[in-house]
Amino acid sequence: MTSTLNTLKSNTGSRKKKLRKGRGIAAGQGASCGFGMRGQKSRSGRPTRPGFEGGQMPLYRRVPKLKHFEIINQKNFSIVNLSKLSEFKESEVVNIDSLVKKKLLFKPKFPLKILGNGEVKVKLKVQAHAFTKVAKEKIEAAGGSCEIINNK
């Protein structure tokens, strides 16, 4: 059998009529319209919003707000500004041990980082785990040197 434009038909069940709910019992979806008997879910204006628990304090409000997340892989440093390095004399070596001796650092738990706040007027040999760009420039401008120590 060949099909022509005047003999084309849609597949059975593909063109289903929309159900008209609440238009009498004989229509098939009358009375309760498929919503069951009584209750909030059978009323008009449904559905309730997501997370609604019938007036009970919902779970998302009962659980405390999450605060103070610990940042994984966070790099913590014991920091010292250049202004504190003014206590050192000409061509002295500045490292964690010398900073602890001069009481500029107290029980350092983390690697040492030098920040660029302040001025350096003397030539120093600074040994630290990290330097800011400005700190490195200021130390080298004063004739000193910056040596990066390996992190352990």
Swiss-Prot record:
Residues 1-57 are annotated as: Disordered. Pfam families: Ribosomal_L27A. Gene3D superfamilies: 3.100.10.10. The keyword Transferase does not apply. Residues 14-23 have a biased composition (Basic residues). Residues 25-37 have a biased composition (Gly residues). Keywords: Ribonucleoprotein, Ribosomal protein, RNA-binding, rRNA-binding. Belongs to the universal ribosomal protein uL15 family. This is Large ribosomal subunit protein uL15. It comes from Prochlorococcus marinus subsp. pastoris (strain CCMP1986 / NIES-2087 / MED4). The gene is rplO.
